[in-house]
């Protein structure tokens, strides 16, 4: 009896310990609702419904509704930027009024139109999309500075909405509206943040290799089955009232993506009949594209919000990398140095860079960059 009693107490102790562990785990999972569990739920939800038609129907509004596509006045507009030219790539850089130093750095590096024209026989156009200074104290002087800057470079496109995070969808509408009105012949359109590096030589070479009449083309870092962020402490917080569903349609990270001209036209058309109050611009882009039946394609060398490793073997393949402000000159020198390109030439060079890329991209602890599969491409 004594042994049985001890065994019983020991069994009860382990049951209690197990119960405490399970309860603690459940509490942790509840706290992490916007993380792993939410992603699992949203991804399952995405494949169960297999269609977002009901989202499109719910967010559709008549063109004359106030929550439909707004119309803002151009304060600065370079309407003759394309001039009916044969434009391979129209590159929009999303910028803020105060970021003049970033714009100047881009003009000298990856946004250098003359370099691409002379070295790659390709016509690209780079313009900066922005709103107005949100701080009323600074707005007057900032606007004067922007006018002076545009007189020198003729590459600013500005409308009279406040340039804030919650107006990013308005900046998206500015871009596709401007394409529709002033540069409809551009074969490809890119949207990029002003804190990324775009390897324009690699990008232009890739775009030139595509069929002439490429359609339904949309590439970038694709987010599939992503859930809305419900934490009010996040700047990406989206309330249920704005978007009540468990996952978004597939979309590309807003840091950088490229579309063909027909996709740009379709997105613009869809945006005219959708509720524009959703301020997460890349998600809104995904909803517009989904309404028109356009599906994003994953390109392994678009880093999205990630940052590429610093290595010549990476530079040979990279398209975009995020989080670059003070190193654009260095990256541009690497991008335009023929010795860097020749590093991966030949059988030995190719094998060397393959091995280096595997070592750089396939670390389990290094996830915020290109995927491991990029090393094999």
Swiss-Prot record:
Catalytic activity: a beta-D-Gal-(1->4)-beta-D-Glc-(1<->1)-Cer(d18:1(4E)) + UDP-N-acetyl-alpha-D-glucosamine = a beta-D-GlcNAc-(1->3)-beta-D-Gal-(1->4)-beta-D-Glc-(1<->1)-Cer(d18:1(4E)) + UDP + H(+); a neolactoside nLc4Cer(d18:1(4E)) + UDP-N-acetyl-alpha-D-glucosamine = a neolactoside IV(3)-beta-GlcNAc-nLc4Cer(d18:1(4E)) + UDP + H(+)
Any one Gene Ontology cellular component term annotated for this protein: Golgi membrane
Keywords: Glycoprotein, Glycosyltransferase, Golgi apparatus, Lipid metabolism, Membrane, Signal-anchor, Transferase, Transmembrane, Transmembrane helix
EC number: 2.4.1.206
Membrane topology: Single-pass type II membrane protein
Organism lineage string: Eukaryota, Metazoa, Chordata, Craniata, Vertebrata
Residue positions with a glycan: 56, 167, 275
Matches recorded under InterPro entries: Glyco_trans_31 (IPR002659)
Main location: Golgi
Cytoplasmic compartment residues: 1-12
Lumenal side: 31-377
Localization of this protein: Golgi apparatus membrane
GO molecular function: lactosylceramide 1,3-N-acetyl-beta-D-glucosaminyltransferase activity
Protein's GO biological process: lipid metabolic process; protein glycosylation
Spans traversing the lipid bilayer: 13-30
Record pathway: Protein modification; protein glycosylation
Name this polypeptide is given: Lactosylceramide 1,3-N-acetyl-beta-D-glucosaminyltransferase
Its job: Beta-1,3-N-acetylglucosaminyltransferase that plays a key role in the synthesis of lacto- or neolacto-series carbohydrate chains on glycolipids.
Record Gene3D superfamilies: 3.90.550.50
